[in-house]
Amino acid sequence: MSRAHAAYANEGWSAPEGGIAGKDGSTRDCSGYGSQGPLFSAEEEVKGTVVRETVGPIEIFRYADATDRVLMIAGTAFAVACGAGMPVFSFIFGRIAMDLMSGVGSAEEKAAKTSLIMVYVGIAMLIACAGHVMCWTVAACRQVARIRLLFFRAVLRQDIGWHDEHSPGALTARMTGDTRVIQNGINDKLSQGIMNGSMGVIGYIAGFVFSWELTLMMIGMMPFIIVMAAIIGSIVSKITESSRKYFAKAGSLATEVMENIRTVQAFGREDYELERFTKAVLYAQGRGIRKELASNLSAAVIMALMYVSYTVAFFFGSYLVEWGRRDMADIISTFLAVLMGSFGLGFVAPSRTAFTESRAAAYEIFKAIDRVPPVDIDAGGVPVPGFKESIEFRNVRFAYPTRPGMILFRDLSLKIKCGQKVAFSGASGCGKSSVIGLIQRFYDPIGGAVLVDGVRMRELCLREWRDQIGIVSQEPNLFAGTMMENVRMGKPNATDEEVVEACRQANIHDTIMALPDRYDTPVGPVGSLLSGGQKQRIAIARALVKRPPILLLDEATSALDRKSEMEVQAALDQLIQRGGTTVVVIAHRLATIRDMDRIYYVKHDGAEGSRITESGTFDELLELDGEFAAVAKMQGVLAGDAKSGASVRDAKKASGHLGVILDEADLAQLDEDVPRTARQNVPIDELAKWEVKHAKVGFLRLMRMNKDKAWAVALGILSSVVIGSARPASSIVMGHMLRVLGEYSATKDVEALRSGTNLYAPLFIVFAVANFSGWILHGFYGYAGEHLTTKIRVLLFRQIMRQDINFFDIPGRDAGTLAGMLSGDCEAVHQLWGPSIGLKVQTMCIIASGLVVGFIYQWKLALVALACMPLMIGCSLTRRLMINGYTKSREGDTDDTIVTEALSNVRTVTSLNMKEDCVEAFQAALREEAPRSVRKGIIAGGIYGITQFIFYGVYALCFWYGSKLIDKGEAEFKDVMIASMSILFGAQNAGEAGAFATKLADAEASAKRVFSVIDRVPDVDIEQAGNKDLGEGCDIEYRNVQFIYSARPKQVVLASVNMRFGDATSNGLIGQTGCGKSTVIQMLARFYERRSGLISVNGRDLSSLDIAEWRRNISIVLQEPNLFSGTVRENIRYAREGATDEEVEEAARLAHIHHEIIKWTDGYDTEVGYKGRALSGGQKQRIAIARGLLRRPRLLLLDEATSALDSVTEAKVQEGIEAFQAKYKVTTVSIAHRLTTIRHCDQIILLDSGCIIEQGSHEELMALGGEYKTRYDLYMSALS
């Protein structure tokens, strides 16, 4: 059985050897990394691991401030003092044991004094143990928060070229996963290691004081232990970093999928993406298992050598007593001191492993923090008080860093004067947007120079230069927050009045005021709750509120209908005409650049790169009658300024209102007519927390999920039983050995001494073998746990992809938070399985076997100890419950959301100089979390200290009561020693269980967050079987369809819509931005479910159809084309797995992109970059169109599919789409703001405020003389 089986156990999936099978029975090969190319480089595959450095043991604390250093110093002092407790105890124990064996005086009187000293030691341990946990936990929280902040700041500081090579998903995985590893290595786990290490050192020092000869003999094995620890530590470090790197790739993949979830679902690629993700996490799983086995091998060797040393110690100790060199008290004190010291050193291993892992995890993070980018926003430079003269490109040679062999500009020279209005025109992919990028200094040219006011841009203060620039990009990026907050990002200190005025100019004010919450309306993650046009107008308002000296407009109005475009263009013209504003425009609609002072026509000549072939005013270029004039004629744009104020006034008159707002009575009536579920009644802002609260997580559930690895858990439990039972059992041998030594002190019987030593000392070899075997088997916990982690990660990822789009609109369910779940939370759940079972079983065995031994040898003493156990266990449980109370507050992960959103929109963050704003928001989220972390550390430390005090108190009580029994003749010294030591081990392990409470509490909170998603059944469920008989053709009808977004429950987006899309017909949807056009398309893709009414396909209710089958018959091209990291070929083939190269190329020809692709150096194997960053907007859109056409669907949905294209290219693409439709008899539904695009549709539907106001063919609507005719005439007047 392959490892992939584990990922689907008990969840309705099977994974036969060599592949992953979905519910449909189809099997996919898992030998590679899907079709997206190899997961790792050939060099990495050959090596079998990723060799990586670690930071130094001191360097990892480089970001500690004075407070942290004081806390760490104090915590270290407390830890050392805590470690001294057991050696001090060994001295007291040896003295009182000698006194009791001597038979002189009252045993009870002597024990009372010793017990009182033990209580004093317990008080000291309370302070010391609480202190070291508190100090190190708080210091770690503070440092990791600072590291996260610095890493985030450093990542945002990096140049765009660096970001082109580092996906946001991988960076987010480092932020969430690796920083947790760092914290786990430098928190109280490290102080536990210091405590255990000091116990070892002080124990050995005490041993040398009591008997240097015996101590030397006992520590003879130490060189072997040290060498073994060093070797294993190095191996674990390399394996850990390898695992981290592999999962960083998996995290990047997952983030990209979640950000492009509409594309994934529309093309039914959930199984494919699950396969890719599974492949990636299986790599990480393999390394994780190796790490667990290596760590347990280290522990096995160390513990075995320790027990071997006990055999040697008792043999040699007996001779020292016989020779009169030492008495029994010295031997007992030495043995216990070195014994506890050895145990202390043995317990250093987990802390050492965690510390090593943290140093490995810190390496890449610190490397990023230290990196000084070549284009550095934080660097100084020549001040830029304003823009006065010009921007000059002087012999610029440029290639993108990700494609250094593909020269874009070989010798670009041009000058943009201050106050000048300049436009760039040309076919898609010719380099227009690259000019915009160079002006913002996203990149530096590889030759020549860009000068500002005669100064090289490299020498300017970059931050001040970007402050001079306002930009609206082709694909506007918004941020989670309100309308007001997003507009104000353009000018953080803008007043409300300035924001409102900017929104008026951008023609979005009336839309905002029609919403229930107005300017406080949330836009959703990356603006997901807004239409494309609304997002673009918000982005325009964001640029306008800044009133910048330089305004860059990269297809700023491409997503707007003609009315909105004219209104916004008028506002932009007013801004331009105020004077002093330098404007650089990229626009494919030549009518919008008619008034430019200068227009540059750019042409791309394949391998020769791009160059300016024509330049001049609009009229001059028409007179030139070159390539620009040919495009202008194609668009119907004539010389002269035909745009009039009347046109703009007509546009304003034609504007409709947006939205139908429901009052409480309407909502109540709607809920009565169409009942809502309990989940749907929860406010969307509270929904994530509500789902976490109702999540059910239990140990039995985890056991069922991992039942195929029950054998490994059984071996692990066997190891816990062996290890747990060995400790109390060894106390029997020790007790008998001490009796032999004590009797010799009284009788001087050498023969009895020899025979007793020969009988009992070799028994420690048995314990050595048992412990070695036990710790080796203990590694199977890690084996099972790693498999469980992989299963949960795969299951969570699968369930995330299963959710409907409504899920991703919920606050706290964005890609960043979900990526954090896949990384950190799933890893934390591991603790509930392997380590949790091991600790519980081991603790139970130690306590149970200790009590059994105690009852056998002295039942009265065992009863006293048993009566004290609830106190210790209760204290540990209290600590765990209190910590758990603070971990619940982690739900939400605001910091993860901020990180993912900022990194996904890094170009916008860079353009708007928002780095410090994002850092401040992230810092505020960290600051909000800090008090909870500190309180958790203080509580954890306090209760841990109390636990240790109770341990010493219980032992003092047992010791005093045992002496009382000796005085009464009811017990022998041997019985008291055996019972006391066996109970001591049980009590000590109970304390260790308490120390583990923090991690378990965190793991439980993580598990609830994870299972709140795993258990969620979406309203539109792809796994719900439906009718697979779709009928013939594709005839669609909407009957009284009403739709409301859950994020805006009072706003009706579609109000009782009735329409029909006939089979094999072409249908166009037009209307003002935000009127519901995209909603119609997204409902057809089953992204959202209607609120009421009926949508039918060939007479069948769409909601009754099998979703997977339905989506196999549709294809969609969204307004913002979502591409994936990989090659051009892979992205086109994404729509239809198994398509031949010929079919891919044919689809590319229809989308008019084939001839461009074959001119690229790597052709169809050209990497497109994260989200297609390596391509222009038009190139991305055409590849997305090719992908859609390759599917050969019954229904083709086009949402502004050609908005980023120039008119020449658009016309050719439109020809390809029409030819495709005619050939395959496809039903098409198109949204377009360019009315010429849909003029030839069989049916055109005009929507306004969620209602249909007109519908019919172009000729019918023109004859009607209504709203459509007004809009069409307005559109054509702008082109004439």
UniProtKB/Swiss-Prot annotation:
ATP 2 binds at residues 1071-1078. Residues 72-357, 713-1002 form the ABC transmembrane type-1 domain. It is found in: Membrane. The chain crosses the membrane at residues 73-93, 120-140, 189-209, 216-236, 297-317, 326-345, 713-733, 762-781, 837-857, 858-878, 938-958, 976-996. Glycans are attached at residue 1113. SMART domains: AAA (SM00382). It comes from Leishmania enriettii. Its EC number is 7.6.2.2. It catalyses: ATP + H2O + xenobioticSide 1 = ADP + phosphate + xenobioticSide 2. CDD domains: ABC_6TM_Pgp_ABCB1_D1_like (cd18577), ABC_6TM_Pgp_ABCB1_D2_like (cd18578), ABC_MTABC3_MDL1_MDL2 (cd03249). ATP 1 binds at residues 426-433. Keywords: Antibiotic resistance, ATP-binding, Glycoprotein, Membrane, Nucleotide-binding, Repeat, Translocase, Transmembrane, Transmembrane helix, Transport. It is an enzyme of class 7 (translocase). GO terms for biological process: oligopeptide export from mitochondrion; response to antibiotic. Gene3D superfamilies: ABC transporter type 1, transmembrane domain, P-loop containing nucleotide triphosphate hydrolases. This is Multidrug resistance protein 1. It comes from the Eukaryota.
